[in-house]
Curated annotation (Swiss-Prot):
It comes from Vibrio cholerae serotype O1 (strain ATCC 39315 / El Tor Inaba N16961). SUPFAM superfamilies: Riboflavin synthase domain-like. InterPro entries: FAD-bd_9_SIP, FAD-bd_FR_type, FNR_nucleotide-bd, Riboflavin_synthase-like_b-brl, SIP_C, SIP_fam. This is Ferric vibriobactin reductase ViuB. Belongs to the SIP oxidoreductase family.
Length: 271
């Protein structure tokens, strides 16, 4: 997440309601006085969310004093998420959470959230646009990337062309997504016994579009999958580095704290 985002004072937000988008994707709607003035037209952008301290269950947000960040006694748990939708008229913000149980800070909070539940937020940030203008687009991601990809598709021009590959562990996570007619969406169910990342295989088998003078791509999700996809996009499709936004959200076997620095190394690598 950019330095610009990290300079924004944390907002304290209140739970409003929640609903399932699919079997393992839960949408939580938030509001609050601190949300007033949240930037519009930032659907799909990155945000950093602060959850209650896991030991005490107390939510205390950090404060800034000059160039210093002062952390409270009950340090909150930070995680990166996506703005699914912000509605200024009702002052409501939607965040979609991947939920596989109560063991993770974000998914666990979303499952338990009820009237009176709160979280902190800074942002939004990240590149704008999230996918560069081009004649043809390639988008790929797992369930954690579906909120961002859905938001991007909603903002794309109606004449946009390309392919979208969405990887899920459970076919019941397949759901309708609004998209330009010529952006073809393909849902892929991951085989845990398959060695090669399913998204990379799908991109590799995709025929290079005829007559397209420019290509752009957006890839997000698990670390190894993002790296594999990016290599193919750079080495086989010859898409320019500045036309690819590839961001690993997570790494299998590691939590956010253990993976944070490695993520930035991966994002800065050249292929």
């Amino acid at each position: 997440m950019s330095n610009e985002v990290e300079r924004v004072y944390p907002r304290l937000l209140d739970f409003v309601r929640k609903k399932y988008v699919s079997k393992n994707l839960l949408r939580v709607t938030l509001t609050g006085e601190d949300l007033i003035g949240f930037p519009e037209d930032q659907n799909g952008s990155h945000i950093k969310v602060f959850f209650p301290n896991q030991a005490s269950g107390i939510l205390q947000l950090p404060i800034r004093e000059g160039d210093k960040v002062i952390w409270p006694e009950h340090k909150p748990v930070p995680r990166a998420y996506t703005v699914r939708q912000y509605r200024a008229q009702s002052n409501e913000l939607d965040i979609d959470f991947v939920v596989h149980g109560e063991g993770t800070p974000g998914g666990g909070w979303a499952l338990k959230a009820q009237t009176g539940s709160q979280l902190g937020l800074i942002g939004p940030g990240g590149p704008d646009p999230l996918i560069e203008p081009a004649d043809w687009h390639i988008m790929a991601g797992d369930l954690s990337a579906v909120p961002a990809i859905s938001a991007i598709l909603e903002k794309m021009p109606s004449q946009a062309k390309g392919y979208v590959f969405l990887e899920v562990d459970d076919i019941e996570d397949k759901h309708d997504i609004s998209h330009p007619e010529q952006m073809v969406i393909k849902w892929l169910v991951r085989d845990p016994n398959q060695a090669q990342p399913v998204l990379a295989m799908a991109i590799e088998q995709l025929p290079v579009p005829q007559g397209a003078e420019s290509l752009s791509a957006f890839v997000a999700g698990e670390n190894e999958s993002v790296i594999a996809c990016r290599k193919i996009l750079r080495n086989e499709y010859r898409i320019a580095r500045d036309k690819i936004y590839a961001i690993p959200y997570w790494k299998r076997g590691k939590n956010e704290e253990a993976y944070h620095e490695e993520r930035h190394v991966v994002m800065d690598e050249e292929f």
